[in-house]
């Protein structure tokens, strides 16, 4: 009977866990819909920003301005890389499957790849899980911040990027990339690696559409071309991080929704298995009692 009581307790415990995971799945589904909408709107803004970049660069090319002095821009084919800053984004919480692990693996892979080429790598971390991992393993993270990946905020992203941009402009680093787990669809995510600094010259040659550029930019902005590009580039870099945070949050909710759905289904299966075990144990107990009663009756004859 003690065995039956143990099984009953296990069934009750698993059912309670099932209720929790199911509730977490519903919460993640609701949050995912909101995050997906924000990501969609933010992507539209990012594309508009890219279009403005293209217009300005095309206009400069049409005017015969090929030599861009802005430090934000480099000719990628001739760029010599000696130092790289990697900004990684992970979640502040767990229970989201391989979401954080996959990002960390990619960061380690990129770090090793650069080191094999004798390129110095510095890490900048956003998200408690990633920062904890590297701290536990004795890997230095230059700048770290928590509670930003779970609550993306443009002002905080802007502040975080300020130091990164300063290091780039002062020559402390030659390249800045962002690594995060991005939202692909409701049931899948993908690791994304994006170079945000420097911005390559090749953008000029990808958009030879002078008429469209002239139609889009109808007035002459004040300041030199490089000043205009610096202002746009600064906004582009800041928004690149902000969009990555939004994209990562949507992917996190997607991963957690899947993880909780899997956990709920596993709990259902375990309840079925335990119920079968309980019924078998109960049947065995009844059979044993009947055998003992019959044996007692026979002994009294």
Swiss-Prot record:
GO terms for cellular component: plasma membrane; proton-transporting ATP synthase complex. The keyword Kinase does not apply. InterPro entries: ATP_synth_F1_ATPase_gsu, ATP_synth_F1_gsu. It is a peripheral membrane protein. Its main location: membrane. Gene3D superfamilies: 3.40.1380.10, ATP synthase, gamma subunit, helix hairpin domain. GO terms for molecular function: ATP binding; proton-transporting ATP synthase activity, rotational mechanism. It is found in: Cell inner membrane. Signal peptide: none annotated. Keywords: ATP synthesis, Cell inner membrane, Cell membrane, CF(1), Hydrogen ion transport, Ion transport, Membrane, Transport. Disulfide bonds: none annotated. Belongs to the ATPase gamma chain family. F-type ATPases have 2 components, CF(1) - the catalytic core - and CF(0) - the membrane proton channel. CF(1) has five subunits: alpha(3), beta(3), gamma(1), delta(1), epsilon(1). CF(0) has three main subunits: a, b and c. This is ATP synthase gamma chain. It comes from Helicobacter pylori (strain HPAG1). The gene is atpG.
